[in-house]
Design a protein with these regions (language model features):
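Bacterial N-terminal signal peptides
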Residues: 11-23
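Short, small/polar residue-rich loop motifs at catalytic or cofactor-binding pockets
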Residues: 272, 383-386, 408, 457-459
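M16/insulysin-pitrilysin zinc metalloprotease superfamily fold
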Residues: 295-310, 464-471, 478-502
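Bacterial N-terminal signal peptides that target proteins for export
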Residues: 2-13
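Noncatalytic scaffold domains of N-terminal-nucleophile
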Residues: 27-58, 62, 70-235, 240-242, ...
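Extended C-terminal subregions enriched in glycine
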Residues: 319, 453, 485, 493-552
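Internal maturation/activation junctions in enzymes
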Residues: 308-405, 418, 425, 433-434, ...
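Active-site rim segments in enzyme catalytic domains, especially the processed small/beta chain
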Residues: 83-109, 259-261, 398-466, 494, ...
Length: 592
């Protein structure tokens, strides 16, 4: 468990907590959901923010101090992440914002997923031989969907916040103007994508200094992005999707060979969607609906698993059952899930306890089910280059948000004069049925591109609530987001505290390839041997088995905050895997 320090720092700060009343913050371990009979507090003692970058967490804290609520703070955190984590998210991308309004008790998800432009038909992504053009699907203008993140920031401020949008954007505008130190992952990521990014004049203008690429430790300023944010703050939706910024975006896409229309930008809309809700062992789980695949998969896995008391099982059998639930949920993900505005998603059936009970009956508690006995084809993936933040404010409002540009530095294209790095989310569609995408996996008809359609996602911002606790959690990590959130929920149910949950060892199974991926030290030698004896194939760090990814992939960056209603104590956890720097959990009290 991390040790809390009362001293603030900007470097390496990953969770910043604002205490607004005498009760103190604590990272003491969470107890079971019904362990206490103490009175339930009406409101948290303060506010908690957990994000992947110190400056983003600090920006949210600043807005809370200025009188904003969790939704205003979310605007500040999201926009600042767009400035300081360009490898992962930005105004040129999209995301999901799961919201809880404490006053009304209402939960809603803002779907700000990117949409396919009219030009984005399957045929446009095939070469002369009819094969998938991989360069076009992940690089440049053709790989980019119409961005949704700016519209989400406008909606958060207008419908849910209490401060002007311009005020909540002020921290990100300042940081974009004054700059921040380049960290190692930024510099290394640019080096790995340099050939693509330097194809485009607008990108070269931002990332080259005297002809040389950004280097670790130097101050990175983005005046064009600051101007774009300023226009968004001054003019709201029209400041990005119409007028000056829109004209520059359209010109940049056209110059790079793409085809966007002004009406497509002006016509973008955030969708309000009803979250998926279900019960698990005394917890109410609220999570993301389609076009996220996460909520339906979580409902299936947890409702399968509630047939056993996992906390009483040995490591081998517990892991076996969790993996078997993953296997079945990911099989269904492939066949049934897509944008609900275009595809008939059987959500009621897939999230029902009866359906989960039927799946549970197919699990042998002592033997692995070969994936080829569960008919179908592999699941489409998305990349690790995503970010997540979690917020609880002093009124009890909550935000869980996951946002992305898809691959490392998205499409690599910045339309000149905007500072906006465009996403490459078009690769998350099934661009050619039966052909693997950038990650060697397949896609099928439910996720085929159509004008205005939103691509399937694994982003899974989630709330947990019991009589005693309220929790927000989420993580980046591509298709493994869902299983990492699952393991986080199981950790909380087992009584772990927030920091312990964020640091839990992780493993993953996605049906096909039929292999358990695991990070370093996820399994003891005895557990690994026991799983293999049950018939599971393991891909452990150092292995070279085909289809496995071992520890070379990032295993998420989980950010979570927790309110213990009985003790009226807030705590939080920030993932020690965070690639920006070493994870720390720190406190801020009034006057600091």
């Amino acid at each position: 468990m991390s040790t809390f320090s009362p001293r603030l720092s900007l470097r390496g700060l990953l969770l910043l907590a604002l205490v607004l009343a005498p009760p103190v913050w604590s990272a003491d371990g969470a107890k079971s959901a019904a362990a206490s009979t103490a009175p339930v507090a009406a409101h948290p003692p303060g506010a908690a923010i957990a994000s992947g970058h110190a400056l983003a967490t600090d920006a949210g804290l600043q807005i809370l101090r200025e009188g904003g609520n969790a939704f205003d703070a979310a605007v500040a955190v999201s926009s600042t992440l767009a400035v300081v984590e360009p490898i992962s998210s930005g105004l040129g991308g999209g995301g999901f914002f799961l919201l809880h309004d404490a006053k009304t008790g209402k939960d809603v998800m803002l779907d700000a997923r990117e949409t396919a432009p009219e030009s984005a038909t399957e045929a446009q992504f095939l070469d002369k031989k009819g094969e998938l053009d991989r360069d076009r699907s992940v690089n440049g203008a053709w790989s980019a969907g119409i961005p949704g993140l700016p519209a989400a920031l406008v909606e958060l401020a207008a419908k849910h916040g209490r401060l002007p949008l311009k005020q909540s954007l002020a921290p990100s505008i300042r940081i974009a103007t004054e700059g921040f130190p380049v960290y190692a992952r930024m510099a290394k990521g640019y080096a790995s994508r340099r050939e693509v990014m330097e194809r485009y004049p607008g990108t070269r203008q931002v990332y080259l200094r005297g002809g040389k690429p950004i280097a670790e430790g130097e101050i990175f300023k983005q005046p064009e992005l600051a101007h774009t944010l300023q226009l968004l703050g001054d003019k709201g939706f029209d400041g990005f999707y119409k007028g000056e910024t829109a004209k520059k975006l359209l010109a940049g896409v056209k110059q790079a060979g793409g085809q966007w229309k002004a009406a497509e930008l002006a016509g973008y809309r955030v969708k309000e969607r009803t979250p998926i809700q279900f019960d698990y062992r005394g917890w109410k789980i609220t999570t993301a609906p389609p076009p996220s695949s996460g909520g339906i998969a979580l409902a299936a896995m947890l409702q399968i698993l509630e047939g056993w008391d996992l906390n009483k099982l040995d490591d081998v059998h517990r892991t076996h059952l969790v993996v078997e639930s993953m296997r079945r949920a990911y099989r269904d993900r492939t066949f049934f899930l897509g944008d609900p505005d275009f595809v008939d998603v059987p959500q009621r059936v897939l999230t029902s306890k009866d359906y989960a009970q039927g799946l549970r009956a197919t699990i042998n508690p002592d033997k692995a089910t070969p994936s080829d006995l569960l008919s179908g084809n592999p699941t489409p993936l998305e990349d690790d280059e995503t970010t997540h933040f979690s917020i609880i404010d002093g009124e009890g409002n909550r935000v869980g948000a996951t946002q992305t540009v898809n691959l490392l530095y998205g499409s690599g294209l910045i339309p000149k004069g905007t500072g906006v790095l465009l996403n490459n989310e078009m690769d998350d569609f099934a661009l050619k049925p039966g052909t693997p995408n950038a990650f060697g996996v397949m896609g099928y008809a439910a996720n085929a591109p159509k004008p205005g359609k939103r691509m399937l996602s694994s982003m899974t911002p989630t709330f947990m609530e019991s009589a005693d606790k309220a929790i927000v959690l989420g993580t980046p990590g591509g298709s493994r987001i869902i299983t990492m959130v699952l393991l986080g929920i199981l950790g909380y149910d087992a009584g772990l505290d927030a920091q312990a949950v964020s640091a839990l060892p992780r493993y993953h199974h996605q049906w096909l390839p039929d292999v358990i991926d695991a990070e370093t030290d996820a399994f003891s030698p005895q557990t690994a041997k026991g799983l293999e004896a049950m018939g599971h194939a393991l891909k452990l760090p150092g292995d070279t088995a085909e289809g496995g990814r071992g520890s070379s992939h990032v295993w998420g960056n989980l950010q979570t905050v927790e309110w213990d209603k009985r003790s009226n104590v807030l705590s939080g956890g920030s993932d020690p895997r965070n690639p920006v720097g070493k994870a720390q959990v720190q406190l801020a009290t009034p006057g600091q």
